[in-house]
Amino acid sequence: VYAGGFLMAIGHFMMAFESMFFPALLFLILGNGLFKPNLVSQVGNLYKPEDARKDRAYMIYYMGVNLGALMSPLVCGTLGQKYGWHYGFGAAGVGMLVGLAVYHFGRKSLPADLVEQREAHRVNNTVAVHEPITKQDYTRIAALVFLCIVNVAFWAVYEQQGNTLQLWADSKIDWNVMGFLVPSTWYQSLNPVFILLLTPVITRFWLHQSKKNSEPTSVSKMGIGCLLLGVSFLVMYGCVDIIGAGKGSLWWLVGTVLILTAGELYLSPVGLSFVSKLSPLKLVSMLMGMWFMSSFFGNILAGYLGTFYETMGQKSFFMMLATVSLVAAVVFFVVNLPLKKLMHKDTDLEAPLVKS
């Protein structure tokens, strides 16, 4: 984590100089590869493998990531446009160093019982890391690979919000709100805003379900995420006829992104939690990287699907996206119970706890 953070900070500072652009990108790529999977796996290490609170912990982590994504264009973008991009990229480097400082000093603020628990786990984990991969581990890895493949379908549809949905919004939405012409680019801010608003709501809802022993398993939550994503594009399918040849209300877009974001929160952070629960200790970071790679392939597939936007027509295109999402949801729901058996877990993968 430290090495990755410092490499990214150096990369951001190098971006301030135009001649260093490509070496800076290399530093950012290498740094992100070290930083992201390892930090994510450490979130899981704060809890026991079967602890139901992991899903909610990753939700909080995910909210923090998106808070940074919301702030970065406001701070770095404003500095870049007003004072020059040297300052914008320099601010990003400073922000990375501030984040590392918070990470370093925050490690000393863990509760005493958690520190003792982590020390006990550290001893056990040291032994486990040197143990050979078992047949049970291989079956779990195979299950994770399968879920990563299904995850590609989710991201292929989800990433249309920055692609074809933006094109549709530019041409079919009336951006005039009470006499104020809203820049269409502001649409891209809806998703991080909704993540910040919905995260505490969904987290509390899961806690409420946990107290009643009705909290869904991680795989079921991911199925719900795909289901919500499909519903969001069914909304788009319906509004095409309602809007017709004219322009529609901005609320169509807001409602679609709201449902789409709820689907994201049911899948993305939960997927991170699921990988943390099932991965062999020596492979947690690598398998986290594999999970992130599924979104990479999802983005590639999203670009391919986007090529059908003009040729299929809007209604057929949105129905296709909804169908892909709903099929992925069905796959998640169907494999939920077999996966629990495949993972050799007699109890639920989450073993819901009342304590938040």
Predicted features and spans:
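Structural signature of the two symmetry-related core transmembrane helices
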Residues: 1-14, 18, 217-235
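Helical-face signature of the major facilitator-like transporter fold
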Residues: 21, 25-33, 151, 155, ...
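Cytoplasmic helix-loop-helix junction between adjacent transmembrane helices
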Residues: 33-63
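Intracellular loop-helix junctions on the cytosolic face of multi-pass helical membrane proteins
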Residues: 49-50, 76-183, 202, 206-212, ...
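Loop-to-transmembrane helix entry
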Residues: 53-60, 165, 172-197, 211-224, ...
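Glycine-rich segments within core transmembrane alpha-helices of 12-TM secondary carriers
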Residues: 53-81, 88-99, 188-195, 285-302
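A membrane-interface helix-boundary motif in multi-pass transporters
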Residues: 78-94, 215-220, 248, 307-327
